[in-house]
């Protein structure tokens, strides 16, 4: 791996089948140990129940308010500054409950790849 700076381009945001908008900040085979994405849930939006196999995920809440559900735990409110740690294989979903979109960084180790994603709502 060589040193580099990945530039942010708002136009790179896309809608992901999970139910939120994603902007991949860093996700490359050249850096297999970690990926970072900016996720955005619109007002009232909610992700599908899902889990990531062999990947630990962390949500770093940047803006808005939400309710996160993890495995069999009771739903918990989250807001700016909170960090949610999601073990590999743990069922999860998050919902925007505030008056503005819920924005968070999703940090995955190792990096997120489509094959690790399992939709549990199907």
Regions found by a protein language model. Give the residues of each.
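Ligand-binding loop in jelly-roll beta-barrel domains
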Residues: 30, 75, 80, 88-114
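A short, N-terminal "cap"/entry segment at the start of jelly-roll beta-barrel domains
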Residues: 1-34, 48, 116-122
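A structure-centric signal for secondary-structure junctions around beta-strands
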Residues: 33-35, 55, 101-102
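A short beta-strand-loop-beta hairpin characteristic of the jelly-roll/cupin
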Residues: 46, 52-80, 90
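Short intrinsically disordered coil segments
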Residues: 40, 56, 119-122
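Conserved hydrophobic/aromatic beta-strand scaffold that supports enzyme active sites
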Residues: 22-24, 36-40, 58, 75, ...
């Amino acid at each position: 791996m060589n040193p580099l700076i990945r530039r942010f381009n708002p136009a790179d945001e896309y809608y992901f089948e999970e139910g939120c908008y994603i902007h991949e900040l860093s996700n490359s085979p050249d850096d297999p140990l970690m990926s970072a994405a900016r996720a955005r849930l619109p007002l009232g939006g909610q992700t599908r129940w899902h889990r990531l196999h062999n990947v630990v995920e962390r949500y770093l809440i940047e803006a808005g308010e939400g309710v996160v559900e993890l495995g069999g735990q009771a739903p918990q409110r989250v807001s700016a500054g909170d960090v949610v740690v999601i073990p590999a294989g743990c069922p999860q979903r998050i919902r925007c409950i505030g008056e503005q979109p819920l924005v968070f960084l999703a940090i995955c180790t190792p990096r997120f790849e489509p094959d690790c994603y399992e939709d549990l709502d199907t």
